[in-house]
Design a protein with these regions (language model features):
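Sec/Tat signal peptide C-region and signal peptidase I cleavage site
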Residues: 21-27
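An N-terminal domain-start capping segment
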Residues: 9, 22, 71-73
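Small-residue-enriched, tightly packed secondary-structure blocks
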Residues: 28-183
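Bacterial N-terminal signal peptides that target proteins for export
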Residues: 2-13
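Cleavable N-terminal signal peptides
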Residues: 13-15, 25
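Generic cytosolic/nucleocytoplasmic N-terminal low-complexity/intrinsically disordered segments
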Residues: 1-2, 25
């Protein structure tokens, strides 16, 4: 009797899963597609600010674009965003960035971030979730000519572009990334 009831519950759960799973997967696909489209727009904005950045897009082994990073703080701060990862110009996955900071800081801002990977080893470290940026690593502001003088450090170079907001800070923190390959 107990086995029959368990079997009915299992069949019912599988039935419900069949009803809702396609909707969940579709929502994930739409979210992923939105991030990819936002990344394309962010790439265009970076190139508009600094046309010479085209050389980095062309010559790097890969790059990750985070089109919408939100940051806020009052003493302790945090930031986060999702992005698209490219290898040789082709989308290979998505990534999530999380940042925590501590120090004298207040406000909020939105910005874009792009990370260029000089070689396969640097991209592999990123995909293995082994790249973290500490307070000593800073992004280069994307403006005309900035990428011409940019140098890779440990196989990566980072650019950011402010989208809006005001942030006053003297803080230390770090960024951590989580990579997820496309399905």
């Amino acid at each position: 009797m107990k086995k029959i009831r368990m079997a009915r519950v299992a069949i019912f759960v599988m039935f419900l899963s069949g009803l809702f799973l396609p909707g969940i997967l579709k929502a994930q696909d739409e979210s992923q597609e939105r991030i990819i489209n936002d990344s394309r727009e962010a790439k265009a904005a970076f190139l508009k600010a600094d046309p010479s950045m085209g050389n980095l897009f062309k010559n790097s082994h890969g790059y990750a674009i985070f089109p919408n990073v939100g940051k806020g703080a009052i003493g302790v701060g945090g930031a986060g965003g999702k992005g698209t990862v490219y290898e040789k110009g082709k989308v290979i996955g998505t990534a999530q960035m999380v940042q925590v900071t501590v120090g004298a800081q207040a406000g909020g801002q939105a910005y874009r971030e792009i990370i260029f990977f000089e070689n396969k080893e640097a991209l592999d470290r990123f995909m293995d979730n082994k790249i973290e940026f500490s307070g000593q690593v800073s992004a280069i502001a994307a403006k005309a000519g900035a990428s011409a003088d940019a140098n890779y450090r440990s196989g990566v170079v980072v650019f950011s572009q402010e989208k809006g907001g005001l942030m006053l800070e003297a803080s230390l923190g770090g960024q951590k990334f989580t990579y997820k390959p496309l399905k």
